[in-house]
Amino acid sequence: MVPRAAGGRLYSDTMGRLTFILFLIYSLPVGMHHLLMDPEHGNATKFIQVLLTAFVSVPTLLTIFTITASLEIAGRLRGGRGLFGWIAALPWERPMVLATGLAFVMLGFGDFGGMINMGYDMNAMVHNTSWVTAHFHLIFGGSVVIMYFAIAYDIWPRLTGRDHPSLSLLRLQLWLWCIGMMVMTLPWHWLGLQGQWRRVANRHAPRGRLRGDNAGTQASAVAGRV
């Protein structure tokens, strides 16, 4: 969808299919690195999660390369010259292209935080702090959700047969989402380095309430996986 919106073509269909398969293999259980230092997880499990996090960085980089190469093709077809001239030649007024660029910005910060979470030593500095919260908000709430918006903008006219009343409003919404995520998460990173807690048990939980909370947590986990 992104290459088509930019006026180009996909750089490599094979690489796109390969990254999809690698993500299916490596990324489904990899979110446990957000809990890497929690004592209920054994050392073997933690080691496996570190490996999976390292492995999932490969299809992530392949995806970034493929999309960037596809956008470069589109930019050069539109007359872009020089090493970076193709970037300015892209149709940034189109919501799908703009969302991709903003997603890359948030993905860069989010991936950097993920690499910190991956390491035993560096993870010990930021575990259970707002750094971790900032990381996964940038990855999912930032780069993933903004692309959901762009896909919805692209699909809606095809489903309804009606054009959007204003592309300016769509672009404004994308910019506001990106700016809002950055304003929220960058201070979280800094506060995490200062030791701001992510989770804290600051009240007594009666046994009955605890059982109810556990049941709700397990139901949410099953529903989320489904």
Where in this protein do the model-derived segments appear?
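Membrane-interface helix caps and helix-loop-helix hairpins in membrane proteins
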Residues: L35-A44
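Membrane-interfacial, low-structure loops and terminal tails that flank and connect transmembrane helices
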Residues: A74-W92
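Hydrophobic cores of alpha-helical transmembrane segments in multi-pass integral membrane proteins
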Residues: M1-A6, D13-L36, Q49-I73, R94-Y120, ...
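Glycine-rich, flexible loop/turn motifs
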Residues: H127
